[in-house]
Structure formats: C-alpha cells, structure tokens
C-alpha cells in the first residue's frame, strides 16, 4: 500500500486563489491589506522564509513591509520598531521572525506585538483566547495542518490523534484546536517524557509529528491506514529532513510530504490572518 499524498502545494494554490479574490474586493473599497515582517540578523533560513512570505504577498496582492534589522540590535531598539508597526495603519498584521539572537528576550518581544496585528497567532493573549474558544488569530501551522486533513477528507470527529512534540508553535496549540467541538478529536500529546511512544502512535488514527527529530517516526510505529502529518523540520549534513521516515508511506493511508505538505499552508494561513483582519476592519 502506498499512501495518498496530502499535497500542501495544491491546497495552498486553492487558498491563494480565494485570498486574491478577497483582496481584490477589499481594494475596490480602497483598502489594501499589509503584512510586515521583522527580521533580526542574517540567518540564511530565516531570510529564505521571509523572502517566501513576501513573494506570497505579491502573488495575492497584499502590500508587504520589511524591517530587516542588524543582529546586534538592542531590546529597546527592537521594541521601537514593534511600536512603530503597532501604530502603522498600513500594516494590517505582522510577524517577528524567530528565532531571535540570544541576547533578545523572545517572550517580551512577542508580548509587545499588538494582539490584533499578531499574524502568527502566537501572542499570549491570542493563545489564551484559543484556550477559551474565543475568536482570535489562529496559529498558522496548526491551522494549516487541520485544514489540510479536512481538504483531503481525513475524518477528525471521534478520531484518536497523537501529537508528537509540545512546542508552543505546533504541539500545544494543535491539541487545543483538535479538541474543539468543530473537530471533536481525542488527543494524546507525546514528548520526550512519553514512556512508550510507539504504543501510542500505533493506536492513532492520525499522527502529527512535530518533534524536529529527523525520521524519528518509522513504519513499525504506524497503524495501517493512519493519516500522518510530517510537521517537524531539522537539518542533517546540510539537508532538510522531516520527522517521518520514508518507509511510513508504505503503511499509512495518507502522508503529508516534507517539504511540500504543511509548510506551504503555514504561509498561506499567515496571509489569511492578515486578509481576515482587513475584512473585519472593513466591516465585511
């Protein structure tokens, strides 16, 4: 058995087509959504990610604003840039590209962002609203992951879902999102303290691998026919690798490739959050 490919590029193109129409409708009302990025330092991976985000904006018709800053910027200088974007009406939403240099306090930086302009959905206020099931920008990778499963008809209602990884960007929020009434899944959150990870994953209908450990999920850990999302990214010998071993494709019913699975949807839902806020401000 060879798994169905959960093609994130295909679904991203569908989302972009919809967003482009929505942006065109906003422009007819004189409103141009704007996405800003704040990039500190010269990390090649971060520069690549930011470049792709601005290319996405160009494709959809969203105005893009860049703030590329030196690696030795002080906390107060970075706060000043964030305060500027908070006050800039042309900036509908923005992100601070992580990771930041070690001398900067990431949590303090994220807390400085206006929660309404938090395009990543990772501000403490917005994560708190997720816990309370109140409307707020949703974290992009979990939102993209769940939407990808829905796009390809993977049943979530009543499904046993195992999430591997407890990070704030994926593991913790996706568990909250999957247990909403709209998804109604039963979620087990696994991590480095889990005693028998394989026993947990073999019982799962859906596995979300977000540990950042190359090829850690192997075929013998997967129930035949299960759906597997490969979310984790790591580098080995200069090569980008996901968490899912290639042999999983011979056992699982559906697998998201990495790259080309959840990654494109993370970017798509980043722009989605910006367009959605622009529509809200326009009263649409």
From Swiss-Prot:
One of its GO terms (biological process) is purine nucleotide biosynthetic process. NADP(+) binds at residues 165-167, 192, 233. Pathway: One-carbon metabolism; tetrahydrofolate interconversion. It comes from the Bacteria. Keywords: Amino-acid biosynthesis, Histidine biosynthesis, Hydrolase, Methionine biosynthesis, Multifunctional enzyme, NADP, One-carbon metabolism, Oxidoreductase, Purine biosynthesis. Homodimer. This is Bifunctional protein FolD. It comes from Corynebacterium efficiens (strain DSM 44549 / YS-314 / AJ 12310 / JCM 11189 / NBRC 100395).
